[in-house]
Each structure stands twice: as C-alpha cells, then as structure tokens.
UniProtKB/Swiss-Prot annotation:
This is Ribonuclease 3. Digests double-stranded RNA. Involved in the processing of primary rRNA transcript to yield the immediate precursors to the large and small rRNAs (23S and 16S). Processes some mRNAs, and tRNAs when they are encoded in the rRNA operon. Processes pre-crRNA and tracrRNA of type II CRISPR loci if present in the organism. Mg(2+) binds at residues 50, 123, 126. GO terms for biological process: mRNA processing; regulation of gene expression; rRNA processing; tRNA processing. Residues 162-231 form the DRBM domain. GO terms for cellular component: cytoplasm. The keyword Cytoplasm applies. Its EC number is 3.1.26.3. It comes from the Bacteria. Residues 12-137 form the RNase III domain. SMART domains: DSRM, RIBOc. It is found in: Cytoplasm. Homodimer.
C-alpha cells in the first residue's frame, strides 16, 4: 500500500487505463482510494462512496444476470447476485487492478491481514465504482463493471459452489434464516454405513438425503431442495 499522498501522474494514468476512464475531477479518484485511517479532513475518505458504489454495482450486476440467464428464476438470480457482489469477488477485482499499490491508509491498517484486509480491498472497489459513476455517469460505470464482472458471471454458470453453500445463501436472502441439518438415521455395517439427513428451512417443506457419509447426505438433501425450489436446474434422471 502507498503512503498517504495523492497519486503521481504516472500512477494515475496507469490506473485510469485499467479502469477505462479518464477522470474529469481527479480528486474523486484520490478519495475513492483513501481509507478512513488516512483522511485529513471530514468527507475525504471512501466511506460515502462505498455506500453508493455498492448500489451501483448491485444494479448493474442484477441487469447483467437478468439479460444473461433468461430462464433463471428469482432464487437462482439472487444466489448468483450474492456471489458476484460478495467481498471475495470484489477483492479479486481489486487484485486484478493491483489496487493494493494505490490504496492510501494509516499505519494501523497496513498491519491488517486475511479477511479484514480482503474487506478493505473490496470496499475500495465499491468506492471506485461510485467515483466512476459520479464522474462519468451510469453508462461509464456499467462499462467498467462489465469489463471486470461479465466473465465472472459467465464462468459462475458452470462452476456452482457446493449445494450447502448455495442453499445457505439463498435461505439467508429469501427468509433470513440458516438451514438446519438433522441426522435422522444411521444404518448398515460400520464398513458400509448409510446416513439419512433432513434439511429444514423455516417456511418451506424439508428434504432428505441418504449417503455413505453425513456430509454427502447433507449435500444430497441440499441439492434436492435447491432443485425443488428452482434455484438449480434438476439433474437428468440417472445422474
């Protein structure tokens, strides 16, 4: 991370090239890259921009998914949206832009690691989106988002995460609850056991799965619920 100073002309030109937009008001880009720990005056950091950028990103990603997955239901679209606007995805975009070279922070933040540092990188991406939106308008912001998210949206189609993760995100978004898994039965000999597991989400019918391990049975139950609710397409018979 850089020290608390404005971008050099060379760094600004390099970053604007990666963004695909030359800022009319250069101060907006500086503010988008300034963490609260490095601010010198009220309103000079990215916190307000982050608030706006989160909404602009959500709108553009929702529109992208709506147009890309024409047969997907609301549940599936919500899961995809949550994945694409997550801190993990935003931090990955930050890494692609090498934003760690430009973010301005105080000394205490430079010591952060792991998830907390990932959240800082993700926040800066959202503030950057807001700065682009304010400087160039929605179309320019959309162009930037498509540049770095469209490929991720398409790749996500063939690379769904495990069923338990998908079900948890959907149930949080839809009902505000976490799925509950219960082992109903363990049968068979020790060398070849069978586990029957039920998954429950408040407000809808439960589903069960039977497999040779508890985790595998949970995955089967979660998959059946995702398919029944239209979040995932149902697997062909025999698969």
């Amino acid at each position: 991370m850089s020290k608390a100073q404005t971008l050099s002309a060379a760094d600004r030109a390099k970053l604007e090239s990666l963004i695909g937009h030359d800022f009319a008001e250069k101060e907006r880009l500086d503010r988008a890259l300034t963490h609260a720990s490095a601010r010198t005056e009220k309103g000079s950091n990215y916190e307000r921009l982050e608030f706006l950028g989160d909404r602009v990103l959500g709108l553009c990603i929702a529109e992208l998914l709506f147009r890309t997955f024409g047969t997907a239901g609301e549940g599936e679209l919500s899961v995809r949206l949550n994945q694409l606007v997550s801190a993990e995805t935003c931090a990955a975009v930050a890494d692609e832009l090498n934003l760690h070279l430009y973010i301005r922070t105080g000394a205490d933040v430079k010591k952060l690691t792991g998830k907390r540092m990932m959240n800082v990188r993700a926040d800066v991406v959202e503030s950057l989106i807001a700065a682009i939106y304010l400087d160039g308008g929605l179309e320019v912001a959309r162009r930037f988002i498509l540049r770095y998210w469209q490929g991720r949206a398409v790749r996500a189609d063939g690379a769904k995460r495990d069923a338990k993760t998908e079900l948890q995100e959907w149930s949080h978004a839809k009902f505000g609850v976490t799925p509950l898994y219960r082992v109903d039965e363990r049968s068979g000999p020790d060398h070849d056991p069978r586990f029957k597991v039920t998954v429950e989400v408040a407000g809808i019918k439960p589903e069960t799965g039977v497999e040779r391990s508890k985790r595998a049975a949970e995955q089967v139950a979660a998959t059946k619920m995702l398919e029944r609710e239209g979040i995932w397409q149902q697997s062909p018979a025999g698969n």
